[in-house]
Amino acid sequence: MNILFIADPMANFKTYKDTTYAMMREAYTRGHTLFHTLATQLTVVSGSVQTTVTPFTFIGAQNDHDHAWFTVQTPFQAALNTFDAVIMRTDPPFDMQYLYATQLLTLAEQQGAHVFNSGQAMRDFNEKLAILNFPQFIAPTIVTTYAQQVKEFLSEYQDIIIKPLDGMGGMGIFRLTQSDPNINSILEILMRMDTRTIMAQQYIPDIIKGDKRILVIDGEVVPFALARIPQNGETRGNLAAGGRGVAQKLTTRDKEIADTLAPELKKRGILLAGLDVIGDYLTEVNVTSPTGFQEITKQQNFDVAALFINAVERHANFQAAA
């Protein structure tokens, strides 16, 4: 197959843990031909969604993370529907530029491209708001533009988490308690004087045991979660915020949440999702660029990238040579 990855610059990948790298490596090992482009390079020419693609191949040892790992060939312009699969792996934030990219991906799908995850699915599933579709699994939550409502929510629950709807990697997340002397200042900064919508949730003490990432691939739940355990004094378990990743078996509650969401995600055209769970509560549904493949594979000997590429091959109607 010819597979196009829409991703951030490959030279910036941390190959020892990067999930997109793991996907690429697995696809390359199977003999697929790989191409890379940036989301900002998507264009429409004569009605056709196109981009500047760069063919690349792997070089060096698989476990050599200290030297160059790829070599590129001459870039060229190509329509997205000329590839067997297009894998969208651009990191958030989900800003207007990201929105435009998903709209172009939807147009490309209408022209016959196989895009994972679909542009429509990424638009429909805001990674924070998506949990509201599953109220049976979430902690007390409000979404509001008004600081006064957050203060009332804080008064009721005494200890809360507030976060923007378009963040990633734990950026912009604050823990507030009723005794915090900086409540007004924090809300003014985060909510921009009642002009920015945020989410507030009751604080979940189980965060000290880890913010668990549960992966769902084409409706199949990976049997291990990556618990991202915060540093001492932190309330954010995100790896980007310094959290430590520990792969562990799913609990009964984890399975209940994941098994409920999995068929709905598949129905919505979401090939890969990352469910974030703290304790017994679902906190996010990540559909833009979920991570955790390498940590789970290394710690539990469960090949997540193979499961993912299997799913891509199925949806692209690929049949390996006998």
PLM feature segments, named:
Residues 1-4:
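Extreme N-terminal starter segment of soluble prokaryotic enzymes
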Residues 6-7, 13-16, 249-322:
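ATP-dependent carboxylate activation and anion-phosphoryl transfer catalytic cores
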Residues 9, 91-93, 165-167, 290:
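Short glycine-rich anion-binding loops that position phosphate/pyrophosphate groups of nucleotides
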Residues 11-13, 17-29, 35-140:
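Conserved N-proximal alpha/beta basic substrate-recognition cap immediately N-terminal to
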Residues 19-20, 147-148, 155-159, 169-255, ...:
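Phosphate-binding site of ATP-dependent enzymes
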Residues 119-123, 228-230, 278-281:
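Short glycine-enriched loops at secondary-structure junctions
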Residues 141-145:
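Short acidic-hydrophobic, aromatic-tinged amphipathic segments that line or gate anion-handling sites
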